[in-house]
């Protein structure tokens, strides 16, 4: 074990902590030559001392509490995907295949979050896993992956804005859709310029509403299944007589259900996207809070996703015409359809208010996540350095503004092809997110190999992931396979529009990867050196940014009352 690392582990040197916050290892770009066209980026030679960057640009602040971190993770996931896009999934695949799809994605999500937890608690830096790919895979791959992941959250913000007005139109269409989009566009953008502690506090209370609403709906659904509704006991009524599997795809082919399952995966993945958000907060939260949040991911997934999908499939038949009728996205929400079918007249309006709150919260998280990813990319030297600038509250304001600008995509909903635009944006964000998930697993594999090369036991880490390294390989392989096959239906009746909708994120990633590679290394011999294509294990930086999780500054105050204890266990 290296001497500096041993000093860090023992907490014997305060000076070592100053060294360990350097944003990136100089080893990643030993062979880089600073050319004229690279001067707008932070180069490794420019960031030898983190303090010099902080003096010039400022830095983010660790003002997020444990409860904030957990709620941000929940706030970014319980949103449009769960409440709205699950209707399309249920209609396409039927209740059983929808549930299987959710369980399958749960295994991927568990693998990815475990990998991320082990890395982010050890090196808690902003936009963490975007920097991990840069450090342990390659600088160009890290740049491409980071920018694609940022792009997915920027586009998702536009998607949330495109939906929020249509959800409000469940009550009235007196106000134009563009007006609602503009109102929330401005409010959410301005709010993200406030210090992160305000963001964390608001997100905590909004996410609390989500949790209470989802728990309440699950209890309501159970009661309706048992017979409290106007239709009497429902039980597994909609799973019998062929209802369980839906119509599938390829009606005249024995593989129609497999095809439906693969086709529905993209909706499932979009619903789960955001469970990794807890690691994005790493630079502004206690590593102990991260560890606690990661450990509860499986509980959240099983309750908020799998149970909800189970009850939706029990209460709403896959061929219910309301799942596909026109009249706004909320009309297609299985949550509201279940209430309407059960004869509960008031609850749909109450729950629609929850959905509005949920989408606003998700949009808020989109800007936060995207801006911190962009900040992390600038730290890693793969984004313009002005994205490092922070205001007095520690908010990277240029990164916030640039991310929020993509909310303008929400105005696509005002066109006659609003539903098509929603599907287009959903596919882009889900596929981009899945690519990022795959590279989280790749980074973790490289991280574990580097630890092994140095003789460092994973038992000494603040958080040790389960089922490793097999789980990381599983996550990597499955993510990349799904990315490649998720759009297979476009090849049956090929047209360019559907092809690009399905694979634009893949194309963008490859273009970014190749483009950044030649940008950093030029077109000479350096660009073809194996050490520039894949960082050698001996040069992988696992020292910069390491923090001692036992430091007093990371202490988490114990719950003061029953209310605090409840949230400590749930969130």
Curated annotation (Swiss-Prot):
Single GO MF descriptor: amino acid transmembrane transporter activity
Membrane-topology descriptor: Multi-pass membrane protein
Any single Pfam family the record assigns to this protein: AA_permease
Region named Disordered: 1-36
Keyword field: Amino-acid transport, Membrane, Transmembrane, Transmembrane helix, Transport
Record keyword Cell cycle present: no
Annotated TM spans: 69-89, 93-113, 148-168, 174-194, 204-224, 260-280, 297-317, 343-363, 393-413, 422-442, 465-485, 504-524
GO cellular component, one term: membrane
Compartments it resides in: Membrane
Family: Belongs to the amino acid-polyamine-organocation (APC) superfamily. YAT (TC 2.A.3.10) family.
Function (record text): High-affinity permease for arginine and lysine.
Protein's recorded name: Lysine/arginine permease
Organism the protein comes from: Candida albicans (strain WO-1)
Lineage: Eukaryota, Fungi, Dikarya, Ascomycota, Saccharomycotina
